Curated annotation (Swiss-Prot):
Name under which the protein is recorded: Non-structural protein V
Compartment(s): Virion; Host cytoplasm
Keyword Zinc in record: yes
Region ranges (Disordered): 54-98, 145-172
Keywords tagged on the record: Host cytoplasm, Host-virus interaction, Inhibition of host innate immune response by virus, Inhibition of host interferon signaling pathway by virus, Inhibition of host MDA5 by virus, Inhibition of host RLR pathway by virus, Interferon antiviral system evasion, Metal-binding, Viral immunoevasion, Virion, Zinc
GO CC term (a single one): host cell cytoplasm
Lineage: Viruses, Riboviria, Orthornavirae, Negarnaviricota, Haploviricotina
GO biological process, one term: symbiont-mediated suppression of host type I interferon-mediated signaling pathway
Family, per entry: Belongs to the paramyxoviruses V protein family.
Chief location: virion
InterPro entries recorded: Paramyx_V_Zn-bd
Length: 224
């Protein structure tokens, strides 16, 4: 025999369902508790208790959010940038272009051609360009001493160690800058066994074969 729900019973079921919905909307929800028979108020229709574990509503608390963000942040590594040229050693030249003779180097000024006087907003740029060209040509015209280039042979010698320097020697270095409308050059000598660095530095001999002074840097230290 079929059972039919009367119209007034349908209204009662709808009203009961609305009461249950209002109850759960107004009651505080605990994240660790699930919907069970004990959480439903007495008097509601038994059909609404068919599957109490169907929905388990959980709201993350502040502690959960903190631990979640902390977990993501733990995978981020901080990048540490080493100081430039930290392992090159040597002594930094603080003011190479204002140094005086007798401190291990010589300061010279590359004089400009008096007939060439650029004007305008790019005057300093043009003067610096002219001074650089004249400085380069001045050094190119002078004879330079160079170390002999050995032929490369695969597997010969130790690949990681510095090549032997039985004779030793010095190399001339220059530091160029634009100072107060003039191109100034500071030049000095370093042992050929020392590294070549971007910053102006005094280096000491590492191989034990480089002389303390050479014919190029004798005048750098002033009169004897």
């Amino acid at each position: 025999m079929d059972q039919f729900i009367k119209q007034d019973e349908t209204g009662d079921l709808i009203e009961t369902g609305m009461n249950v919905a209002n109850h759960f909307l107004s009651a505080p929800i605990q994240g660790t508790n699930s919907l069970s028979k004990a959480s439903i108020i007495p008097g509601v229709a038994p059909v609404l208790i068919g599957n109490p574990e169907q929905k388990n509503i959980q709201h993350p608390t502040a502690s959960h959010q903190g631990s979640k963000s902390k977990g993501r942040g733990s995978g981020v590594r901080s990048i540490t940038v080493p100081p430039p040229e930290a392992g090159n050693g040597g002594t930094q030249i603080p003011e190479p272009l204002f140094a005086q003779t007798g401190q291990g180097g010589i300061v010279t000024t590359v004089h400009q051609d008096p007939t060439i006087q650029p004007t305008g907003s790019y005057r300093s740029v043009e003067l610096a360009k002219i001074g650089k060209e004249r400085m380069i040509n001045r050094f190119v015209e002078k004879p330079r001493t160079s170390t002999p280039v050995t032929e490369f042979k695969r597997g010969a010698g130790s690949g990681c160690s510095r090549p032997d320097n039985p004779r030793g020697g010095h190399r001339r270095e220059w530091s160029l800058s634009w100072v107060q409308g003039e191109v100034r050059v500071f030049e000095w000598c370093n042992p050929i066994c020392s590294p070549i660095t971007a910053a102006a530095r005094f280096h000491s001999c590492k191989c034990g074969n480089c002389p303390a002074k050479c014919d190029q840097c004798e005048r750098d230290y002033g009169p004897p």
